[in-house]
């Protein structure tokens, strides 16, 4: 670029920054925050599938799936992880179904959690926008999009037609929210439900509620499904769960995480550590015995999980080593080359009898 153009560009940039504030325009390479800040989801295998170690701050995230698949559990696990880092979280409970006892069991500090149970969809989204603009809230969860009922529909008669009303309301909210969330570095998670499209002969008949705007504005979309039951004798104690990253703007999409959600406990973190540790040769398995750093930690997976639960420092060290290995781009190619030779281990394998 010649000298005159450089001067003109510098003057234009200076004028823009003077009018709209510092940071309103910059060269892409000058942005110090190119590495997106993330918060752990509470599941190691999901953090790895996301490719960045968690869900991104300052972005919109959509989590959808069938009923009782673990959508709210996933968000409560993330809130607990965020609170442990000293972050402020809010839960907009449009379904009026948040269970504080269950939230507390998952590690959520309910005394510090901000909760709103709005009357209308517009009120819920206005509260969400106000919290984002405040700059004091780090994580907002909206449960759920399907329950964001427009005021006109609530005040109208049963059977009245309100074509596209909710979709228009959400589309306007997305336009307002996106910039505010980015400026305040606040993550907004929308939980969504699944509906069936009528008359679809070929392809997937499933769709999510609230129109298409949320699909476009979301940086990450997670599809969570229950794939089986975990039994202790005859009693069902948890669910096998598969989480697919169907959209990802911060890393490669379409990866899957298989995990377990135990009733009243949340993610089976110790089970994930054992499975990933064995897969990547950090935990040795000889017959039914599991060993870590040469020391036997249990006979059978259930006992190995129990050992890690009783020794949180060892579990924390193993978690840190696995994250450093699996989230380091330099190691990803090596892992991809050796994974075909290694024995595949299902993250969500059914644990042996407790």
From Swiss-Prot:
Single Gene Ontology BP annotation: DNA repair
Locations listed in the record: Cytoplasm
Record key words, sorted: ATP-binding, Cytoplasm, DNA damage, DNA recombination, DNA repair, DNA-binding, Nucleotide-binding, SOS response
Keyword Cytoplasm belongs to the record: yes
Chain positions recorded as ATP binding sites: 65-72
UniProt signal peptide: none
Major localisation: cytoplasm
PROSITE patterns: RECA_1, RECA_2, RECA_3
Family matches, as InterPro entries: AAA+_ATPase, DNA_recomb/repair_RecA, DNA_recomb/repair_RecA_CS, P-loop_NTPase, RecA-like_C, RecA-like_N, RecA_ATP-bd, RecA_C_sf
Family classification: Belongs to the RecA family.
Protein's job: Can catalyze the hydrolysis of ATP in the presence of single-stranded DNA, the ATP-dependent uptake of single-stranded DNA by duplex DNA, and the ATP-dependent hybridization of homologous single-stranded DNAs. It interacts with LexA causing its activation and leading to its autocatalytic cleavage.
PANTHER family: MITOCHONDRIAL DNA REPAIR PROTEIN RECA HOMOLOG-RELATED, RECA
Protein name (Swiss-Prot/TrEMBL): Protein RecA
Species of provenance: Vibrio cholerae serotype O1 (strain ATCC 39315 / El Tor Inaba N16961)
């Amino acid at each position: 670029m010649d000298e005159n153009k450089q001067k003109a560009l510098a003057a234009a940039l200076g004028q823009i920054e003077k009018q709209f504030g510092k940071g309103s325009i910059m060269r892409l390479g000058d942005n110090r925050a190119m590495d997106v800040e993330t918060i752990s989801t509470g599941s190691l295998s999901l953090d790895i599938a996301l490719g960045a170690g968690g869900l991104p701050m300052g972005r919109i995230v959509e989590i959808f799936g069938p009923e009782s698949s673990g959508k709210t559990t996933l968000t409560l696990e993330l809130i607990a992880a965020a609170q442990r880092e000293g972050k402020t979280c809010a839960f907009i409970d449009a379904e009026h179904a948040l269970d504080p006892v269950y939230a507390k069991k998952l590690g959520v500090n309910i005394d510090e959690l901000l909760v709103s149970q709005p009357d209308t969809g517009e009120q819920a989204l206005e509260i969400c926008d106000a919290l984002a603009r405040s700059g004091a809230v780090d994580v907002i969860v909206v449960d759920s999009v399907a329950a964001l009922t427009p005021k006109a529909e609530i005040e109208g008669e049963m059977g009245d037609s309100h074509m596209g009303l909710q979709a228009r309301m959400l589309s306007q909210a997305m336009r307002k929210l996106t910039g505010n969330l980015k400026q305040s570095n606040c993550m907004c998670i929308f939980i969504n439900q699944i509906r069936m499209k009528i008359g679809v002969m070929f392809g997937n008949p499933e769709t999510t509620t609230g129109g298409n705007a949320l699909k476009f504005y979301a940086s990450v979309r997670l599809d969570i499904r229950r794939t089986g039951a975990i039994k202790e004798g005859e009693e069902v104690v948890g669910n096998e769960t598969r989480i697919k990253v169907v959209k990802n703007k911060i890393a490669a999409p379409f990866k899957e995480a298989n995990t377990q959600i135990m009733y009243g406990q949340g993610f089976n973190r110790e089970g994930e550590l054992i499975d990933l540790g064995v897969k990547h040769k950090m935990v040795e398995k000889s017959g039914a015995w599991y060993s870590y750093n040469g020391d036997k930690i249990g006979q059978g997976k259930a006992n190995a999980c129990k050992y890690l639960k009783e020794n949180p420092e060892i579990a924390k060290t193993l978690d840190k080593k696995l994250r450093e290995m699996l989230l380091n781009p330099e190691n990803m190619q090596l892992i991809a080359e050796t994974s075909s030779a290694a024995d595949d281990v299902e993250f969500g394998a059914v644990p042996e009898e407790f």
